[in-house]
From Swiss-Prot:
HAMAP family linked: Cytb6_f_PetG
Keywords of the record: Electron transport, Membrane, Photosynthesis, Thylakoid, Transmembrane, Transmembrane helix, Transport
Protein name, per record: Cytochrome b6-f complex subunit 5
Subcellular location: Cellular thylakoid membrane
Family the entry assigns: Belongs to the PetG family.
SUPFAM superfamilies the record matches: PetG subunit of the cytochrome b6f complex
Stored Pfam families: PetG
Cellular compartments per GO CC: cytochrome b6f complex; plasma membrane-derived thylakoid membrane
Location, primary (coarse class): membrane
Molecular function terms, GO-annotated: electron transporter, transferring electrons within cytochrome b6/f complex of photosystem II activity
Presence of keyword Transmembrane: yes
Bilayer-spanning residue ranges: 5-25
Coiled coil: none
Length: 37
């Protein structure tokens, strides 16, 4: 049974990606003019 492991990896990647996007958006919201962004 490889499906549970595969689905777990996919969910983990999705969570990490969303967390990274929210973190970047939060930093950009807190300091909008830093590093030309």
């Amino acid at each position: 049974m490889v499906e549970p492991l595969l689905s777990g990896i996919v969910l983990g990647l999705i969570v990490v990606t969303l967390a990274g996007l929210f973190y970047a958006a939060y930093k950009q919201y807190k300091r909008p003019n830093e590093l030309g962004g």
